[in-house]
Amino acid sequence: MTIAMLLTLHLICVALSVSLFVARYWWRYCGHALAAARWTRIVPPVIDTLLLLSGIGLIVKTHILPFTESGSWLTEKLFGVIIYIVLGFIALDYRQARSQQARFIAFPLALVVLYIIIKLATTKIPLLG
C-alpha cells in the first residue's frame, strides 16, 4: 500500500471517527434512540482500529518515529490522541457513572484536543518545542 493510499484511508477514518463521535454525543445528549443502537457500539471501534492501523502504516512507510528529534510533533500528537480518547470516554460514558456536567465539559475539551492533534499533523511543528 502506498503512502498516498494510507494517508487517504487515515483521513477518511479521521473524518468518520470524528463525525460519529459528535453524532453519538448529540444523540446521547438529546436522549435519541440511536444513542443506544447496536451499530453505534460496533462501527466506531472498527473505524478507530482502521485509523490506528493506517497511522502505524504511515509511521512504517515514512520512517518518522515518535520519541525522536525529527518526530517530536508525532510524539505530541500521540499524547494528544491519548488525551482525546480519555475525554471521549468521559463524554460518552454509557454507564451513567459520571455526571452530565462532567460529560458536558469533556466533550468540548475533546474537540479542542482534536484541533491540536490536527494542527500538529498538518504543520508538523511541535507545540512544546
UniProtKB/Swiss-Prot annotation:
One of its GO terms (cellular component) is plasma membrane. Residues 24-41, 93-104 are cytoplasmic. This is Protein SirB2. Required for maximal expression of sirC, not required to invade host cells. It holds the Pfam family SirB. Its main location: membrane. Keywords: Cell inner membrane, Cell membrane, Membrane, Transmembrane, Transmembrane helix. Disruption phenotype: Not essential for the ability to invade cultured HeLa cells (the invasive phenotype). The chain crosses the membrane at residues 3-23, 42-62, 72-92, 105-125. It comes from Salmonella typhimurium (strain LT2 / SGSC1412 / ATCC 700720). It comes from the Bacteria. It is found in: Cell inner membrane. Residues 1-2, 63-71, 126-129 are periplasmic. NCBIfam families: PRK10278.1 (NF007622). It is a multi-pass membrane protein.
